[in-house]
Amino acid sequence: MFKSLFILFITVSSLLSMTGFANSGSTITSANCTFQLENPTRGNCSSVVIAPGNDTKVNLLLLNQDKLKKPLNAPTFPNLTPRSANHVFFWSDVKTQIINMDEENRRWWHTPSHCVSFEGGTRDYNKAVSINKAIPESEKNLLYQAREILGVMCAYSDSVSTTYPLEAIGINSSQGSMFLSYIKAAAYFYGEAWPQAIEKFSLISDSPDPWIREASLYMIARTQLIQASVSAIDRWGIFLGPDLVDKDLLNKAQISMEFYLLNYPNGRYTSSAVGFLRRLMFLNSDYPALTQEYARLTSATDLSTRNGLTNLEEIDRLSSQLSLTPGTIRLAVNILALMRSGDHNQISKKELESQKQYFSNDPALYSFLLANYAFYVEKDFREVLKLIPDEAQKNSFLPLEFSRQALRGMALSALDDVDVQRFWQDMLNGVDVIYQRPIVELGLTTNYERKDKLTEVFKKGSLIKDSYIRKTRLLYAADYDILRDQAQNDTRPKTEKDLALFILLYKQLTRGRYEEFVIDAQLVPEKANTHNHYISELEPDSKIPVGIFRDGIWSDGYPCPSISITSGQLAFNKSKGTLDSNQKKNSQYAKALLCLGDFYRLNNIDRLLDRQFSKEPSPSKTIRRGNFYSNLINDPSVDSNDKAYALYRVIKCYSPSGNNSCGGESVNQAQRKDWFKLLKGKYGKSKWAKELNYYW
């Protein structure tokens, strides 16, 4: 009998949601993760500074941890590379990394909802079997295997088939038969045959075994709740609304759930049953009761657990349907979200002030909300300082305390206050290393940069310990001297040295500092990375292709030496004055310039030229190969083969889209046609004229 029963239900026909609706949430989906102090809008990721731009779930978790006086449980950085070095994150990163979930929990996030508890249920079942002395050992092994086979029903597979390897006749003891009956009921449950599951669990709900008795009562209520929701869930597992729920079945589920809790107020499944009661409140549209329950959850229970995260996402998902009056944490999170820049329904100052009554027991949180409004909406930075006193010298910071002081630091920075450096330095003494310290270091670094003291970031014994912060400054702010020093600083990680050297050589080459390039290119190590396909997306945590300056591609038809030799030729001609636009360029210079253009093209340097990698000069001041070619075309001193190649290349700049991919001043199609006619006519015998059949 059991064999046919198992095969009958072994294929899971649909992913019915135990939680009742799809996870819409408010998780940020943008890939834009910028590590920055201010966070005014959803366009960026979240950080440990509670702010309007954070995912509302992150803010809710931070405030929950603050209420419980707990720091974030973060033994290490999450693996977010290349998204801003782990200091900012998506909500999904919080779930998988900050909470430090184990392998079982990671699987739990991606399991059909009614199968979520399978592994935990298996452990409970196996333990109950093992301690039941009335079951022979030989039968226990059969019962363990029977439970294990049920797991196939929760596997993702289009076609799953198996056979039950043991005959039911192998279980002869009374207690063993009771556990086998539980397995049969569970098979109906995992096979989504809800009425049959309820019937089978009911038959064993008065079992003499204490675990079967409790588990069966719990499973009756759980199955009834799922059955009541079936009519409100479409084929894709999307919840269609409470109105489509079977209210009669829902009432039965509520009676069963309350009966379980009455008999087991501190049972194995009490926490889960309380969660199901919240689901019943939702399905019955009892939002006042649900609001009260969520207020209790956010203030009194730890949301940084597996069950807590489920509750947190549930709270966030339903926030628009619930009253905001009770529970200052949830109200605060919603108010912060209404401060986001660009939102059409941004909260007004009058509306914010009208909420004061709800924060009578939490003045620090309310003044923090007022300070956020002053900073992000009103841009009244002095008001922020009035609302948040200086407490930078604390020995430690809970999430709200840290966020308050970080906001004060941002206001000081916005005012360019003389005290800002001292403030950030004081905060360093009390912050945690993993998440809080990088925020404070960023504030301090920003001040150094503003005061033209960027060397403070890189000097020996610097207060700035964070590698990512140093790399961002190498990429976007460091001058030639800092870049050269860091490229040779053996106390730094290889990634920092490679980045410093790459930016140094790139800037030298594209700004015409050829003599310096020849000298510094000797610093490129052997076998350095040359993979440059994603060079346009170069970020601090990218794998740096510094090897292109030593072992890059020099030529694909036009003969060119290494880029160091080419740069040496350009440096020599520059010293002779042949780079002066008013002087004729000699043949050596023309060839070197064409080879520089080929280096740009073959190593994807073109893709970088519009990036702003430093304050001086701007990208518009970089030397573009489009300009190389047009200048050489118009120079009568350039020999015919080089001029033909310049024509060939400048026309190809517009292939295939008609847009200029070479930089420099773009020309219209008529000009490109004239170039093509010139190449095909005057230089028609050249290799380059023969290879080009179109213009764009």
Where do the protein language model's features map onto the residues?
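Bacterial N-terminal signal peptides
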Residues: I7-S17
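Alpha-helical solenoid repeat scaffolds
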Residues: F2-L5, G20-I198, S207-W696
